[in-house]
Amino acid sequence: MIRPILACQDPYEAGRAFQSAGWTLDFSQPPESGDPLVGVSLYGSALLLGVTEGYVSEVELPFLGCGVVLYLTVPDAALEAIHESHRAFRPAEIKTQPWGDRAFEVTVAGWRLMIAGNSPEE
């Protein structure tokens, strides 16, 4: 299993953005803990939202997430509802990809996601 830690200028704000799109808030370390980290998930795909401090220089901040697309799968039957729950982030239309998956792309908290439906046998 892989759980990426995404560098965010404010992990708590990023967590709220993901929550507003229907993601589950798994945990949120208190800001005073010294370890500002937030965990979110969507149908078993989990992300950790961390800080940029110590990981991303000031000059790199405008390029946060550049060139990265996180691909996650959700049940086919839920894809349209998940697309709708991301409406505030202006998701692309759901399309059948050249490899056969139905998916859409959306950017949440500066991170680009491709969310695809999968059939139960996958």
Regions found by a protein language model. Give the residues of each.
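Vicinal oxygen chelate
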Residues: M1-D10, V38-S41, S57-E122
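Core segments of cupin and vicinal oxygen chelate
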Residues: A7-L47
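Short amphipathic alpha-helices in soluble, non-transmembrane regions
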Residues: R16-S20, A81-R87
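A short, acidic/glycine-rich surface segment
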Residues: D26, G34, G54-E60
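Short beta-strand
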Residues: S28-P30, G67, K95
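A generic structural motif
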Residues: E32, E53, S119-P120
